[in-house]
């Protein structure tokens, strides 16, 4: 039973510590994270996954106004 408590505490802390550092690499490139269904225009403004969450990608901030959602 103690093992379950330790496992829960570890998982809780692992997910709790993520938001403070989230998307730092994407923001440094001048981007923002969007769902993968969004098409960044021009294509050169699509930085790929970078450090965005699962099924999201990094697009340059200026391309948001031109983004097309599928």
From Swiss-Prot:
Compartments (UniProt record): Secreted
Note: This myotoxin is the most abundant transcript in the venom of the specimen analyzed in PubMed:23025625. Individuals of C.adamanteus from populations in southern and central Florida lack this toxin in their venoms.
Record-stated family: Belongs to the crotamine-myotoxin family.
Disulfide bridges in this chain: 26-58, 33-52, 40-59
A GO cellular component entry from the record: extracellular region
Sample GO molecular function, one term: toxin activity
Keywords: Antimicrobial, Disulfide bond, Ion channel impairing toxin, Myotoxin, Neurotoxin, Potassium channel impairing toxin, Secreted, Signal, Toxin, Voltage-gated potassium channel impairing toxin
Protein name: Myotoxin
Biological process according to GO: envenomation resulting in occlusion of the pore of voltage-gated potassium channel in another organism
């Amino acid at each position: 039973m103690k093992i379950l408590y330790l496992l829960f505490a570890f998982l809780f802390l692992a997910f709790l510590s993520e938001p403070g550092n989230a998307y730092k690499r994407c923001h440094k490139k001048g981007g923002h994270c969007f769902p993968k269904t969004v098409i960044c225009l021009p294509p050169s403004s699509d930085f790929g996954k970078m450090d965005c969450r699962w099924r999201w990608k990094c697009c340059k901030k200026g391309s948001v106004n031109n983004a097309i959602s599928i």
